[in-house]
Amino acid sequence: MYKTKEIAQIVGVHPNTVRIYEEWGFISPVPRKNNWYRVYSDIHLFQLKVARTLFQCEIVQGNIRKMARDIVYTCGKEQFGKAEELTQDYLSHLKKEYEYALVAVKVVENWLHKNPINDVRQYTRKEVARLLDITPEAVRNWERNGLIDVPRLENGFRIYGEKEVEQLRVIRSLRSAHYSINSIHRLLSQIHRPSPNIIEILNSPTENEDIVTVTDRLVKSLEEAIEGANETLALFKK
């Protein structure tokens, strides 16, 4: 049996976190002594370890955070078999997201080594959006965020050539893999230096970036999340 302070020290969280986890249903209801002090069991310790391990992953996009929370809720209901199954699904999902992230990097590498395009075809924003199966608003947003600089005609209308189409294709691939706007902006500003390491650039925020999110280190964050999912499965096997 454990007191709140003792079990918090074992897991490495603040005692208030333990109380909040009970309130939110992340662990089973905790019995009280006559003096109203909480008394925790090994089941509570196990549930806290699961929550602590999974919540170290800060990625919120692509349903990842919700899947982790569902595992913790299920474990809190003492449905350990189901929680283990959900963890397997979560691990599979993380591995797919990781593959998507690496595939997007390949798209960038292929783009870099492609021969210059001499095609003279030109598109409006609406046409290029339809071509790439994205919305005109997405294209406008990427322009607004400085991911692409689009030339204008004399009348002020933007016109997209094959060079812009290829760059938009790269941006779309990276965004679909959940890379942040900051990461893509950083990549496109450094892409033409000799032998760029695409993954390193995408995962290395600069000192000039005011806000750094976990998706600015997407590949590394996914690797850490996969490690956490494997650690959680190991807890279920004990």
Residue ranges and their predicted role:
Residues 130-134:
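Internal active-site segments that recognize and position negatively charged phosphoryl groups
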Residues 127, 137-141, 170:
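Non-catalytic alpha-helical scaffold/packing segments enriched in small hydrophobic residues
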Residues 16-34, 135-156:
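Major-groove DNA-recognition helix of helix-turn-helix-type DNA-binding domains
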Residues 2-11, 23-24, 28-34, 38-124, ...:
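Arg/Lys-rich, alpha-helical DNA-contact motif
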Residues 4-5, 19, 126, 140:
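Residues within the helices of the helix-turn-helix
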Residues 142-176:
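Aromatic-anchored, glycine/proline-accented short structural segments
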